[in-house]
Every structure is written in C-alpha cells, then in structure tokens.
From Swiss-Prot:
Pfam families: GatZ_KbaZ-like. InterPro entries: Aldolase_TIM (IPR013785), GatZ/KbaZ-like (IPR012062), GatZ_KbaZ_carbometab (IPR050303), TagBP_ald_KbaZ (IPR023435). GO terms for cellular component: plasma membrane. GO terms for biological process: carbohydrate metabolic process; D-tagatose 6-phosphate catabolic process; phosphoenolpyruvate-dependent sugar phosphotransferase system. NCBIfam families: agaZ_gatZ (TIGR02810), PRK15458.1 (NF012002). It comes from the Bacteria. Pathway: Carbohydrate metabolism; D-tagatose 6-phosphate degradation; D-glyceraldehyde 3-phosphate and glycerone phosphate from D-tagatose 6-phosphate: step 2/2. Coiled coil: none annotated. Component of the tagatose-1,6-bisphosphate aldolase KbaYZ that is required for full activity and stability of the Y subunit. Could have a chaperone-like function for the proper and stable folding of KbaY. When expressed alone, KbaZ does not show any aldolase activity. This is D-tagatose-1,6-bisphosphate aldolase subunit KbaZ. Belongs to the GatZ/KbaZ family. KbaZ subfamily. Forms a complex with KbaY. It comes from Escherichia coli O17:K52:H18 (strain UMN026 / ExPEC).
Length: 426
C-alpha cells in the first residue's frame, strides 16, 4: 500500500511524520474524518476491528465487504478519492473465538483473513496472542508467531487470487491491555521492553521464513507495542517519553519498521506529537471520537430542552439510558460500583461503551428527532456559547454553520485536528 510504505520511508529518513487510524464504524465519525482528510488533502486510514466486522457480521452486522461498501459509498458522496482511502483490519486472528479449541478458532481466523483481504483491506494486523480453549496461558512467542505466519500466507494467497498481486502491508504484535480501554482503574503501566519487542520480531521473522514468506518482511511495517499510554473510565495515563526511550531507540535499528500505538485516545496534543517523534508513528484513535460525538449530542440535547416544550423533545438522553438498561451486555462487565457510579459511567466514561448503542433503532429515531427539532429555526448563539463553546468561536468568525449536523461534525474534527498535527512531521 503505497501511502503507508511511503510514510514509513519518510519517517525512517527523519521526517518525524506519522499517520492516524480512525477506528470507528459510526457514520458521523467517518463523515467527519473523510471531510477533514479532504480539506487537508491527506490520505485517510480507517480500520475495522475483528469484533466490529467479521465474516459473520461482527457486532455491527457488517462483513468486511459490507464495511468497505459502506465507507466507499460515504467517500463517494463526499467526493473523496478512493485511492486516498486506506482500509485496515485490526486484531485479526482467533480473538472472537477464544472459547473454541485452537484448531477450530484458527480455521475461523483463516476465513476472517480471507474475507478482509478479498474485500480490499490493505493494512492487516495479525494478532494471534490470545489463548484458545485448549491452549496454555499465556502462549509462547513461537506459537503466536507460527499462527500469525499461517494467516499471512492465507492473506498473500487471497490477495494474489483477487487482485493479481500481493500489495498488503502488515502489522504484528499486540499491546498488553485489552483493546478499547482498560476495564480496571489504572495508575501505572508497564512499557514494552526492548527485549520483548525484539523477541516478538525474531519469532515472527523465523516463523515467516518457515512458511517461505521471507520476501514479505519489508512489508511488515509496524510492531504493536505498549509505549505507556492507556485510559480507564475517568483517568488517562499520559505518555512519559523517558520511560519509553530504550524502546524508541531500539526500532531505529530496523530499516523498514516503526511502532503502532493503540489506546492513544485522550492523550494531550503534546503527547501525541512526542509519540510520533519517538517512532510510535501509527496512532490508533476510536473511543475519543465517539466520546466527542456523544459530547456534542448531549450538548444539543441540553439546547433542545431550553428551546422545545418538554412533550415535543426527543428525550435522547433518557432513550439512551433506557436502552442501555434494557440491554446491558455492552457495559455491565465494564462498569462497577453503586447505581450512581454506573449511571455516570454509562453516560460519561472515557471507555465510551455507549458507542455500541448508537445503531439501535430507538436511539437513532431519538437522534433524528433531536436534529429535526433544532434544524427548524436557528439555534440562538448564546446557547451555542453555553454548551458548545469551541464551536461558538468558529460560528462567530463565520467558518462554521450553526446547524446541528455541522456542530457535531466540527466537534469530532477538533479531536482529528490534534492527530493530524501530531502526524504532520517536519
């Protein structure tokens, strides 16, 4: 994938550039990202995880081909060139099938890889770090690498079969915490050691060699590591460059390799920039974008309550709360404490489990109702100032239209702007 290999080449030549990956399937988040990339004339990397999207539909109900169609249709409607769009698959492996015996889980993983590659995803994260039902815990580096090499072989064959050439790029390794934010309260986080990173790389190099895949090594562009960034429900562990110095220096010995950092959500702009400078040059962001979406919607719901008689209001927040209580499976095992603590977490937690509920038809109807209510007449400027102060400044300067949709999109783009700036390079 030329955009990514070129980015890595420039980074290794000293440009201190990077790329961020938008990890969300929400249409408004994706619209915000596509419009932002379009305005700034940059390529856009959008990733789906093995939980969201798989050959059986994942929790979004979309297969990889569906997801690609959905994103490409959106890009076309916004006149964004498809050759500037990069699709990635995240944590692809037996992740969804850990409760099955390894043989069965890996057979499913083979099909998962085939479905992603056949659909045109070009950035493939091979992650076989999780133990299956009959596996030891934890798995050895060698077993993890052997399974990843097996999936790489499937990917290469599928790519050649469908596109006539193998032009995939790969990411290997995994961060220590669970994807999507930690379940527990955090205070300190272990940074991946250079020795552990080297062991992962060497195990993979050896396993790829055994599968006859040595030639693809330059297309393994990134190793996922833990640079010491994470968030839980109410706290963020900020990047501390000093703790990652040895890890950062270690990757300088590899000609075509950078690091990929997961869970970079909610880091300060300064930390994001420093991560890229320190070679953690692929920054994954997901929950922070849907968190910004949720913030904008809660603000608009508060404006609606000021302007619209109670009986005509959308009641978005109450509808959301009711649906989350009726279907607690996406938050129950994550949010703890008494009733009030869990209520606050449902609405405001950094881990943003509410993102799983936006596709619900009742919530979607309430959202549409909210937008209709506020689109009928101009939103008074003092209310925008009160509830969306960052957007108010842009409305007053004439650079932003004060419609519900534009206010939401712009609020999400404030987060994207931090990532764009971090990745620009010198």
């Amino acid at each position: 994938m030329k955009h990514l290999t070129e980015m890595v080449r420039q980074h290794k030549a000293g440009k201190t550039n990077g790329i961020y990956a938008v990890c969300s399937a929400h249409p408004l988040v994706l619209e915000a990202a596509i419009r932002y990339a379009s305005a700034n004339q940059t390529p856009l990397l959008i990733e789906a995880t093995s939980n969201q999207v798989d050959q059986f539909g994942g929790y979004t109900g979309m297969t990889p081909a569906d997801f690609r169609g959905f994103v490409c249709q959106l890009a076309d409607s916004l006149n964004f060139p498809q050759d500037a769009l990069i699709l990635g698959g995240d944590h692809l492996g037996p992740n969804r099938w850990q409760n099955l015996p390894a043989a069965q889980a890996m057979a499913n993983a083979d099909d998962l890889i085939k479905s992603y590659v056949a659909a045109g995803f070009k950035k493939i994260h091979l992650d076989c770090s999780m133990s299956c039902q009959d596996d030891p815990v934890p798995l050895t580096d060698d077993i993890v690498a052997e399974r990843a090499a097996r999936l790489a072989k499937v990917a290469e064959e599928t790519c050649r079969e469908h596109f006539g050439e193998a032009d995939l790029v790969y990411v290997i390794g995994t961060e220590v915490p669970v994807p999507g934010g930690a379940h527990e309260t955090l205070s300190e986080l272990a940074v991946t050691t250079p020795d552990a990173a080297r062991a992962t790389l060497e195990a993979h190099r050896h396993a790829f060699e055994k599968q006859g895949l040595s030639a693809i090594w330059p297309r393994i562009i990134a190793l996922v590591v833990q640079p010491g960034v994470e968030f839980d429900h109410t706290n963020v562990i900020d990047y501390q460059p000093v703790k990652a110095t040895a890890l950062s220096q270690m990757v300088e010995n590899y000609e075509t390799l950078i690091f990929e950092a997961h869970s970079t959500d909610y880091q300060t702009p300064q930390s994001l920039r420093q991560l890229v400078i320190d070679h953690f040059a692929i920054l994954k962001v997901g929950p922070a974008l849907t968190f910004a979406l949720r913030e904008a919607l809660f603000s608009l719901a508060a404006i609606e309550e000021e302007l619209v008689p109670a009986k005509a209001c959308s009641g978005l927040r109450q509808v959301l709360e009711n649906v989350m209580l009726d279907r607690p499976e996406y938050w129950q095992s994550h949010y703890h404490g008494d009733g009030n603590a869990r209520r606050l977490a449902r609405g405001y937690s950094y881990s943003d489990r509410v993102r799983y509920y936006w596709p619900d038809s009742q919530i979607d109807d309430a959202f549409a109702h909210l937008v209709r209510n506020l689109a009928d007449s101009p939103i008074p400027l003092p209310l925008i100032s009160q509830y969306l102060p960052l957007q108010y400044v842009k409305v007053r300067s004439g650079e932003l239209q004060p419609t519900p949709r534009e206010l939401i999109i712009n609020h999400i783009q404030d987060i994207l702007a931090q990532y764009h700036t971090a990745c620009e390079g010198q």
